[in-house]
């Protein structure tokens, strides 16, 4: 009943869907009353729709049971929506462990900044000149704590933090990816009328993309 499998008790494993089989596997683990659940890529073989449904079911069940769960996944949507804390690893080395919100808003390093988020954060390596850096025709004044410590910095801008307007960063759009409510513009930054070798992604309202 806890797993909503009453209607399938007379079925054989081959007659169950992928999501139902996952719930059966969870049931086998639950009856052992473990102190910790370890789930290793439990949704990797499911299609996108079923993955979303099963993800919500697992999250609801985990909250109901209150059992600590270590969830291993390469899917950041699963990690960000299901985890209280997310540990980001690269080549087996821990990069940052924090809440999903903290990872997104305050990434601990460049790897985490570029990894968390889809599309990924725009990252620009820019040279410092007179306490500022230039991104296209946009001048960014740097904090005093940064000036003098390095010759260049990496500036990160999320796609959703860019807005269409008449002033700011000029870009040539190579492709528009329409996803319904949102659309993503993929292109390159233009400075002084010349295209630069810096790609950029911007999120815009899907109801009227350029």
Model-based region annotation:
Residues 119-123, 131-210:
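Non-catalytic connector elements of ABC transporters
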Residues 99, 111-112, 175, 200:
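Glycine-rich, flexible loop/turn motifs
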Residues 21-22, 30-32, 95, 120, ...:
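Short, flexible micro-motifs
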Residues 1-111:
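ABC ATPase nucleotide-binding domains
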Residues 17-18, 26, 91, 116, ...:
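Short glycine-rich loop/turn motifs that provide flexible caps or phosphate-binding loops at active sites
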Residues 100-130:
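ABC transporter nucleotide-binding domain
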């Amino acid at each position: 009943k806890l797993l909503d499998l009453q209607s399938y008790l007379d079925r054989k494993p081959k007659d169950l869907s992928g999501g139902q089989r996952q719930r059966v596997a969870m049931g086998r683990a639950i009856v052992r009353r473990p102190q910790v659940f370890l789930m290793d890529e439990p949704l990797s073989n499911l299609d996108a729709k079923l993955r979303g449904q099963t993800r919500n079911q697992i999250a609801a069940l985990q909250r109901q049971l209150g059992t600590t769960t270590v969830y291993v996944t390469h899917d950041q949507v699963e990690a960000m929506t299901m985890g209280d804390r997310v540990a980001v690893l690269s080549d087996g080395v821990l990069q940052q462990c924090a809440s999903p919100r903290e990872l997104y808003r305050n990434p601990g390093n460049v790897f985490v900044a570029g990894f968390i988020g889809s599309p990924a954060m725009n990252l620009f390596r820019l040279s410092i000149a007179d306490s500022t850096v230039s991104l296209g025709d946009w001048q960014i004044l740097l904090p005093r704590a940064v000036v003098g410590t390095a010759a260049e910095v990496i500036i990160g801008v999320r796609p959703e933090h860019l807005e269409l307007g008449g002033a700011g960063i000029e870009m040539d759009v190579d492709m528009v990816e329409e996803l319904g409510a949102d659309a993503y513009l993929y292109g390159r930054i233009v400075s002084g009328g010349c295209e630069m070798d810096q790609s950029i992604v911007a999120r815009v309202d899907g109801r009227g993309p350029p």
